[in-house]
């Protein structure tokens, strides 16, 4: 029996692209996008965010604890994963839920 993996379209918001350039080189960014396209439920749902997810992604030599956090939203019915924010753990532990809810509202209206 063949094994079928569904891949999703990954959409990088302008904010994500700007922030990603501060956190990753092109190879690291491509590796993450490939991973999340194949594993759209990899992160944990952020409580109170309306369904946004946060995944921890390790950096070379620092692992997940010293790596980055990516906030994203699945629109799996549309076959889409929206990458919203990326930040280093050393920069911030969590994004306030009211900010995340506003981001999700804007994505739903897009």
What do these predicted regions represent?
Residues 8-12:
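Short acidic alpha-helix initiation/capping motifs at coil-to-helix transition points
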Residues 60-62, 73-76:
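Short polar/acidic secondary-structure junctions
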Residues 1-7:
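Short, intrinsically disordered or compositionally biased N-terminal tails of bacterial proteins
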Residues 74-110:
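Enriched for short, Lys/Arg-rich terminal
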Residues 27-35:
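Short, solvent-exposed recognition patches
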Residues 66-70:
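Short, surface-exposed coil-to-beta transition loops
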Residues 34-64:
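A short, surface-exposed loop/turn module that caps and links secondary-structure elements
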């Amino acid at each position: 029996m063949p094994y079928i993996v569904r891949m999703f379209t990954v959409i990088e918001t302008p904010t994500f692209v700007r922030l990603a350039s501060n956190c990753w080189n092109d190879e690291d960014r491509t590796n993450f996008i490939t991973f999340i396209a194949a594993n759209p439920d990899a992160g944990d749902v952020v409580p109170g965010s309306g369904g946004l997810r946060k995944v921890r992604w390790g950096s070379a030599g620092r692992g997940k604890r010293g790596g980055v956090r990516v906030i994203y939203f699945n629109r799996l019915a549309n076959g889409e994963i929206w990458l919203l924010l990326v930040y280093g753990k050393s920069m911030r532990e969590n994004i306030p839920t009211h900010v995340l809810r506003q981001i999700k509202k804007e994505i739903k209206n897009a």
